[in-house]
Every structure is written in C-alpha cells, then in structure tokens.
UniProtKB/Swiss-Prot annotation:
Name of encoding gene: phnB
Species for this entry: Alcaligenes faecalis
Activity regulation comment: Inhibited by heavy metal such as Hg(2+) and by p-chloromercuribenzoate.
Binding site for substrate: S143
Protein name as it appears in the record: Cis-3,4-dihydrophenanthrene-3,4-diol dehydrogenase
Catalytic reaction equation(s): (3S,4R)-3,4-dihydrophenanthrene-3,4-diol + NAD(+) = phenanthrene-3,4-diol + NADH + H(+)
Length: 277
C-alpha cells in the first residue's frame, strides 16, 4: 500500500526542481496535491501532466491571501488538507557576503528574508485551521545553510537558521494536533535564482559547477539527484510511519557534518578493495 493513499497535500513551489520531483513522488504515493507557484504557465503544465491529481493556485508564497486561497482550493477539490509543505527556496549560494562595505541593503533583506522566512509563516498561518481538523503536519524545506556557514550569503544563512527556530516553536504551539518538521537538502542542481534586489534575478545556480564542488567536499562523493530527497518528505508526511516525530529536521547534507577538517572528505576510501563488492 502507498504511504500517502488518499491524503491531500498543499505544496508551494512545485513547478520545477525539487518541488516538481516531490509532486511526482507524492502522487506516486497516493496523495492529491495542490500547488501554489508564481509561474502560472508552468503551473498549468504541471496540472495537465497529473490529470485530476494536482490542482494549481497561482500566487506569491509571501502573501497570506494567496496561501489561504490555495488551502481553500485543496479542501474544496480534495475534501481536506493533511500536509502543508513549504518547498520553494530562494537561492543563497550566489548571494554576496553581507559585509559593511558589501551590497546588503533593505530591499535585499526584505526579499531574501521574505521569501525564505515569511513564506513559511504565511503558509503555516493559512494551513493551520485545516491541519488541526485533520490532525495533519507541516514540512518546511531548509538547506544545509540552516546548520553551516559558508554555503550562502549572510541573509540566506540567517533566514535558514531562523527557520530552525520556527519549526521548533510551531511544533510546540500546534501540538498535540499538528506535527511540524523540516527537511534540509544539500546541494541541488536546479534552476534556483539569486535575489532580484541585488541584480541577480537572472543568475542561476546552474552556472556554478556544483557537481564538481560537491564531489570533492561531501563524504558521499557526489551531488544528489532531486528525486533522492523526496523520501524524507514522504516519511514525515506519513502519520503511520512518523507519528512521534515533531520538531524534527532531517539533515540530508551528504555527510557534510561529519567530514574531516584535516584529512580527506570521506574516511572510507579503500574499503571496496578491502572487502570486495
């Protein structure tokens, strides 16, 4: 039996990248999905691709009314809401350091914090009543910048660290009716863009040789595919399999937290030759 059979999921940012992969996985696991995304054309294509299983609601994740409209659509179309998944992430890797002499200003603060933090808050606020009724769950997408420095600019790293606190506080405030958890993926080769306020709206993370960089620094020795991250979301969305989990963040960083600071990134090189296989 599929893990999410008959469930209704509200997901933001599902048109491309990890969000698109997650929509596919959720449908495969038996869920119906309502997607909020600013890309109206991409949203129409997504809905057409999953006939009858996906509903689209164009809008801005920072706007409470847009989030409420998507929640209403999910309940109207699929009868209930079981999980809110805040998926869209603003690009941090290309953001310049926010030093006193750098390009950090109020507009970039509002943009990066707004998308990466207020979007979480607005989504939770809109979805909470329906989730309380269904005894559902919230799953927020973080990144390795929620735990480590150096993976993004100051604003992005601050936003992701703040989201850790948001998960813990929301888990407390919504208990015992709603579980609140997070998934922190490592590097992803998707078309995430930089802040428009810094003139980086057309810069994509695809311009960075991410696969080569991660290969050398991550203990697992490679860049993970978007599909490989989706299982963590399915696990947390399944009350049958993760009922005791709330205030939890699954850190899928490819082992960055255990890499050596003096030796090679991974300590198991040579084991294949030693043990065979």
């Amino acid at each position: 039996m599929a893990w999410l059979e008959g469930q209704s999921v509200f997901l933001t940012g599902g048109v491309a990248g990890l969000g698109r992969a997650l929509v596919k996985r959720l449908v495969e696991e038996g869920a119906n999905v309502t997607v909020l995304d600013r890309n109206a054309r991409g949203l129409d294509e997504l809905v057409e691709s999953f006939k009858g299983r996906v509903a689209g609601s164009p809008g801005d994740v920072r706007n409470l009314a847009d989030n409420r409209k998507a929640v209403e659509l999910a309940v109207e179309r699929f009868g209930k809401l079981d999980t809110f998944n805040r998926q869209r992430r603003h690009l941090g890797l290309l953001c310049p350091p926010c030093r006193p002499a750098g390009r950090c200003h109020q507009r970039s603060f509002d943009e990066v914090i707004g998308i990466n933090l207020m979007g979480y808050v607005m989504g939770i606020k809109a979805a909470a009543p329906a989730l309380v009724r269904s005894r559902g769950s919230v799953i927020l997408t973080l990144s390795s910048s929620a735990f480590y420095a150096g993976g993004g600019g100051v604003l992005y790293t601050v936003a992701k660290h703040a989201a850790v606190g948001l998960i813990k506080q929301a888990a407390h405030e919504l208990a015992p009716y709603v579980r609140v958890n997070g998934v922190a993926p490592g590097g992803i080769a998707s078309d995430l863009r930089g802040p428009k306020s810094l003139g980086m709206g057309e810069q994509s993370i695809t311009s960075v040789p991410l696969a080569d960089l991660v290969k050398d620094i991550a203990p697992i020795g490679r860049l993970s595919d978007t599909e490989e991250y989706t299982g963590s979301y399915v696990y947390l969305a399944s009350a049958r399999n993760s009922a005791p989990a709330t205030g939890v963040i699954i850190n899928c960083d490819g082992g960055m937290g255990v890499r050596s600071v003096l030796g090679p990134a991974s300590g198991g090189k040579g084991l294949l030759e030693k043990f065979g296989g």
